[in-house]
Amino acid sequence: FDDVFFKCIDEKLSGERHRSKYRFRVYNNDFDNIKFEIKIKNNSVSYKKTFLIQKELLNQIIDNYNFSLSDITDKDLKKELIYLKHSNYKPKSIINYERDAFKISNNFFRITFDKNITREISNKDFFNISTQKQKIFFDNKVVMEVKFRNYIPTYIINIFSKYNIARSAISKYVLANKFRDFSNDRDIISETF
């Protein structure tokens, strides 16, 4: 989700130190467990607010926020949805990928590998994944994300050093929109595979 000016993309690309990104997420096409996530970045610290929502509510949000606030009991969720509605946030991209995740037990540390990252080209229906997809990377790159709370274990740092793995900022959302003509919100390239 983004506003008409693509504020989330603009803030990411300009390196805004305090920013938020809004998304709805499902795993393995399980639409009974939809997550509304707000990814918040404050300087170098990132964290998420997560709300579980029903499919009906997401449909109402997509349908121009056609829901009753009195039906939403969670005060924090209500506050966030009011912000999205008043800021005119709309669905902009549907991004699909396969994820392998690994974590160290009893340590707030995990590594994920996202591959086969694609975006929907013409489909705006969140619940009906189309076959018209566009690869984000044309050379089958994999995105590795390292997530940790306080520190990265020393042996992991040693592995990163051995293979010259350097930190870089990547956004699947920004990459998914690299072919979009933002002047009138249309795709420049609609090459499918």
Q: Model features per residue range: what roles?
A:
Residues F1-F193:
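Phosphate-end processing signature that detects enzymes handling 5′-triphosphorylated RNA
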